[in-house]
Amino acid sequence: MTDETNGGVAACRPPIARREPVKRVFHGDAVIDPYEWMRDKQSPEVRDYVAAQNAYCDARMAGLAGLRGTLFDELKAHVQETDMSVPVRMDGYWYFARTREGSQYAVQCRVPVRGEDDWTPPEVGGAGDEGGSAVGAGSLPGEQVVFDANREAEGHDFFALGGLSVSKDGRWMLYGVDTRGDERYDFRIRDLDTGDELPERLEGIGAACFTPDARWVFYVTLDDAWRPCEVRRHRVGSPVEQDEVVFHEDDERFWVGVGMSFDEHSIVICSASKTSSEVWMLSTATPEGEFSVFIARKDDVEYDVSFACFEGAGADGADIPVAVVYHNAQDPNFEIDVIDMRTHQPPYTLGEGVRVAVGSPYGCARGDDMEAGAGAKPAGTAYSNPANPRILQGAHGLAIEGIAIHRHFVTLAYRTDGLPHVAAMTKTQAAEDFLAGRPWSFRELMPPALDGDWDVPGRADDGAAEAAGGTLPGATHRLYSIGTGGNPSYDAPRMRYTFSSYTRPGELHEYDPATGHDELLKRARVLGDFDPREYMERRVWVTARDGERIPVSLVWRRGHEPAADSAMFITGYGAYEISSDPGFSVARLSLLDRGVLYAVPHVRGGGEMGRAWYEQGRRLNKRHTFEDFIDVTAALQDAGLADAHRTVAYGGSAGGLLMGAIANMAPQLYAGIEADVPFVDALTSILDPSLPLTVTEWDEWGDPLHDADVYRYMKSYSPYENAPEGADGEAGAGAASTRSLQRQSWRPFPRIFATTSMNDTRVLYVEPLK
């Protein structure tokens, strides 16, 4: 791969693919694609070219072998490989996972509960020692291995667990595995008493669930485009050929899922597109019956429903069965309605019942930006709860993201000011509020603070919050992610929630809504010389070219304050209303310890600031995503926080599309780009409805097949259509007529490291290969 006369890496030559013109014509626009022939995955020529690209990559990276080894050693030195999760109770057992040093996969285990009122999990290790004292010890009394993925993966080049559930009596396990990497799972049923498996296999399916008595399995099948489209019913012990189709979705925009309701009284089918949804239900008391629709679908209306009961809340002491409906029919940031199922009959309509909570209109906190400092309410500030449905009146752009109702408490997940939040209340109070026709009285869970000894919850040291060189005046310094987690049991008396930040390892807490008592159950252990107080995190706001202000998260190591010559690693996503929330990463420490500034622009297209933030970065507004990222990069560099010659950007999947776009639109801002399974041939893929996922993606990107405006708009930013000339003098498809930005002669195109998978069904290998 090298020419020894020119010496080493400098002489590496990339493999040059042959060109075979393939013409496509849509909306009167003819495009010649010279590399479409690479779509044939079985072609020996394609396989050889992939091998040549991999060899070229290995040759170019050979000089970094020492650094890669060092980074691996640093990562391993921080990781607690032998560990144990905090057990969660489901029916008669405590379930938990063990990881062991040198093993690739976790081992799922369980121990019997000590009695019906046993809600104290077996000891994992004290919170003060970060859960590290007992995790490496032997088995707990009565411990049983439920599923050892290391053993199951033997003999397979690829292995992924696609679901695992245990029957209510604890005897039968339903599990699915993928040994091909194509996200089609083979499900089997195992007797946990004997280890034997039943003869029937549900092969190549998407998901499956038991009924509580384990006599029936409901499962989802996929069509040729990998779309989950059908639900079938299987009687355990019978041939799969006798399985019955109970639901089929004809609309190719919709994906289908099936599962048990939280109270285990209903089997629930949800069919959803990117913008609308529909729920069907069947009582577990009559699993052979027919499903009935809960609320009929409506364009651009999403909803979900939880079935629960206000135990003993009726006038005569009877239970009140309720449906808790989460929807956006009247508010784009969602609301919660509670329907008394004694007085309302299906099919229901959105807006029935008592409106107990609602989001608030979009309007992000106009906090500190790179140009001027306007006072912003710090993230995590408590808000009042007046008696009306807008549960947190001081919030900006509050978006409700989900609700869960348990026997003893109710939890609400929402976000405001660009950060996730959790609120809770007792079930008793929820019933009282509902019967009185008033909003629910949620109490916000406050994130744990950081004090001198970081093992002891306290208050943050505001005096240490000064930004580098005064360039970030008054920036918000409490960045965190908080969410409900580890609450699989309807009967649990207390709720669990998770907490983490860019600088603080993940924590699992248990909270009692009745008393307000908060207990730290476990903190992820980071080995070696690690002190979270040595790392800084800030939220700043950058004004984009259209006047919108973009929240940006910054992380660096104390003593390496950002400066004009600093290296910067900047990452983004901005699609599907997915939020890039703060989270801890051991691997990130190696960057920060070397003085690299870590930056996350929360660009439009994500969900950080509510539904309007998403709408401003999709379909015919998609260019906002790319422009936001570019404007943030430029602002940070212009503010003297990073050097363009030392700036590297990262994005994966839809974030890989972002990487391709910024490389074409503003190559001068980036020295390098890492694109992980990048969606860089977006227009070609979205034009072909026979490809996996295409039709359902029209709700996200628009439909260029039938809409000429969408076609032209997508072509204006699709990275493959707009690629500048390469080193070999060739251009991407359509580059001669639609190139959005010619390479600037004074600034080389960024160096790009791209990765893909030959069996990826979401972003086909051919896109980054082309």
Segments predicted by a language model, with ranges:
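C-terminal substrate/ligand-recognition segments
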Residues: N328-A329, G402-D417, V542-I550, H602, ...
